Amino acid sequence: WVVDFGAPENEEGGLERTLTDHVLAVSDAVDRVREQTGRDVHLGGYSQGGMFCYQAAAYRRSVGLTSVVTFGSPADTSGMVPFGIPEDVAGRVLGLVADNLQLWGLPSWASSLGFKLMDPLKSLRSRIDFVTQLHDRDALLPRERQRRFLMGDGWVAWPAPALADFMRQFVAHNRMLQGGFVIEGRTVT
């Protein structure tokens, strides 16, 4: 069973989605799978999808879940601040940015760029590694999917309400680790 939200920029109402919409959709999917199978669910997700899994599990208080497995989904966002910017400064700036994101989201190209800026040295090393191996097709082929993804294939836009809420709750205030994030008006830990 797979929950795929599609590319918000291509889905009707996709750019108006909130973080709560995504978390409740995952929770609803758990209920539907349990109804079909009669069994509890192993919930898994990658990147932001994994964070939705964490959030849905907390929202449900793990009811109906056997396990949660995530890949590339930080529970602690404090180590993600790039360029050595102090976390308290970054938190205040991101809070201000989130307050002003209510009118516009983040296009897919900006999502890709933002990801690369989280670790600019790693991005640069990856680029240099690729260029130095251009002569060796066999060395490049196993990583082609990853290269295409990091170059921009597969990135989607962030809806403004979901992005603002994510930045405010999980980046500026690190609520995934600290607890106390809000889903559908309910405080969740």
What are these regions (language model features)?
Residues 155-189:
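Conserved serine/cysteine hydrolase catalytic core
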Residues 44-53:
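Gly/Ala-rich beta-loop-alpha elbow adjacent to hydrolase catalytic centers
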Residues 9-40:
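Catalytic nucleophile-loop/oxyanion-hole region of alpha/beta-hydrolase
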Residues 33, 56, 170-174:
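Generic structural signal for hydrophobic core residues of well-folded globular domains
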Residues 3-4, 45-46, 71:
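Short His-Asn-centered micro-motif
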Residues 39, 52-161:
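Alpha/beta-hydrolase-fold enzymes
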Residues 27-31, 54-55, 182-188:
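A generic local structural motif
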Residues 1-10:
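Conserved alpha/beta-hydrolase
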